């Protein structure tokens, strides 16, 4: 059984969804039989590599969604508590907003080497917890090495247009399946889990799909 997961490394609910999915897998008797593939999706593909409010995530979201600064801050505070409930530490005050394509190119390279999950995990943590700049080449090289890639792998991912094409094709494929937001889990192209659903909901879907 194959699980495809569309995700953006700048999406706070995608990291939470990853944790909930992992919790569901721990309870799923056939977890070892699953093939899991991460897919790229950008929530804001038109974002500049260095946006105007790079060091102010609250202002960025307020401007993009039409919220007040206070509303944006309150929403993020709620997400921090949600993340904490699944064992994640979110430091939005340190987050550096940037276009996520470079990160997705790294993920595409990592997938080819069987390191897709490791790449997602490390890049999520780099952005939400560590306050890393995911547009900075040296930072991406260091993160790539932690994932299990070489400096040459990272350079190849960031310079060869095929990796951008792979990421963009993932997004197009998701749209064809009805994707409107992330995280988006597709189980054997039969069932979909939309959003960071609870482990119980995810487990129920996995068991239903496995039963045929």
Where are the predicted features?
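C-terminal cap of thioredoxin/glutaredoxin-like
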Residues: 3-6, 13-30, 38, 100, ...
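Structural alpha/beta surface segment adjacent to cysteine/selenocysteine redox centers
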Residues: 19-127
């Amino acid at each position: 059984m194959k699980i495809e997961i569309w995700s953006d490394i700048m999406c706070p609910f995608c990291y939470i969804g990853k944790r909930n999915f992992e919790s569901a897998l721990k309870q799923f008797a056939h977890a070892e039989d699953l093939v899991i593939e991460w897919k790229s999706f950008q929530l804001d593909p038109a974002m500049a590599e260095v946006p105007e409010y790079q060091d102010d995530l609250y202002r960025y979201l307020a401007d993009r969604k039409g919220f007040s600064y206070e509303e944006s801050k309150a929403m993020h505070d709620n997400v921090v508590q949600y993340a904490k409930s699944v064992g994640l530490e979110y430091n939005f005050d340190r987050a550096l907003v940037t276009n996520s394509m470079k990160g997705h190119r790294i993920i595409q390279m990592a997938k080819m080497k069987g390191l897709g999950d490791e790449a997602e995990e490390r890049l999520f943590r780099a952005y939400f917890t560590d306050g890393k700049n995911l547009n900075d080449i040296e930072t991406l090289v260091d993160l790539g090495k932690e994932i299990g890639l070489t400096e040459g792998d990272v350079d190849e991912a960031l310079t060869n247009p095929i990796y951008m094409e792979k990421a963009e094709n993932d997004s197009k494929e998701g749209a064809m399946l009805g994707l409107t937001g992330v995280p988006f889990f597709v189980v054997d192209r039969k069932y979909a889990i939309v959003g960071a659903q609870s482990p119980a909901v995810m487990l129920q879907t996995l068991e239903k799909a496995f039963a045929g």
